[in-house]
């Protein structure tokens, strides 16, 4: 079984004049780990926290890249050098685990301009774009998989919640009346569609947060140091990268 831990970075809202978002890009990233590596990932995260005197940090929801970089709670007592060292160790942890990386990056301005009022919400569309890429990977390796997501991701998005609910009965159906080139795919290798796990209990989701934020900064701000560090993890076959989708 392959677990795809999902986490997003960026505001899924529309930019002016259609909304109030101040950011152009929305990114959803997924880290695929074999089931047997879950305990290793959990222990590795705890080891890194202990190394930096943070073994008391048991709520993994607080293990967020943006929080560390800003020196916000609970990292306000750590100097910038210690925070950078912590971030370095976590990215090294991700690379050494050798997960398979997937992501979808949506330029919200171009997406809304191209499709107008018919444009899918970035939150929903990012999920729909990443699903078939993970499924094709599972077909290639003859494996089964499941999406793992924090329930907070769907709390304020009724359309995403509906998509996931329907997926449990009929799969992730990628079809649209205004885009006939989308596939009608039920993704039979995905088991139970989405498993919801509180992120404070899942180091996998929080490691996905580090990746999604690094990818978002690459597109939104042109800051690519961390992106380059993890780009080698992208699903690749015969020299072609299949793990990423930039839209439109």
Give the residues covered by each predicted segment.
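Phosphate-ester processing/binding pockets and catalytic centers
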Residues: 1-248
């Amino acid at each position: 079984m392959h677990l795809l831990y999902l986490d997003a970075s960026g505001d899924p809202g529309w930019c002016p004049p259609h909304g109030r978002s101040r950011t152009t890009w929305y990114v959803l990233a997924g880290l695929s780990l074999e089931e047997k590596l879950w305990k290793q990932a959990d222990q590795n995260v705890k080891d890194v926290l202990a190394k930096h005197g943070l073994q008391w940090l048991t709520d993994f929801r607080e293990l967020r890249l943006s929080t560390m970089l800003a020196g916000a709670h609970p990292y306000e007592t750590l100097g910038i050098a210690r925070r950078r060292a912590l971030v370095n160790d976590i990215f090294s942890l991700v690379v050494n685990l050798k997960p398979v990386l997937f992501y979808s990056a949506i330029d919200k301005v171009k997406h809304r301009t191209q499709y107008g009022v018919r444009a899918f919400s970035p939150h929903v569309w990012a999920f729909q774009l990443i699903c078939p890429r993970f499924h094709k990977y599972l077909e290639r390796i003859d494996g089964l998989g499941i999406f793992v997501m924090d329930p907070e991701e769907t709390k304020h998005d009724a359309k995403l919640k509906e998509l996931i609910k329907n997926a449990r009965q009929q799969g992730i159906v990628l079809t649209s009346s205004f885009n006939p080139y989308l596939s009608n795919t039920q993704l039979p290798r995905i088991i139970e569609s989405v498993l919801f796990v509180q992120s404070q209990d899942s180091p996998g989701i929080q490691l996905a947060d580090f990746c999604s934020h690094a990818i978002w900064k690459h597109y939104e701000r042109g800051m690519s140091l961390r992106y380059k560090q993890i780009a080698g993890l992208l699903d690749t076959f015969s020299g072609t990268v299949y793990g990423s989708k930039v839209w439109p």
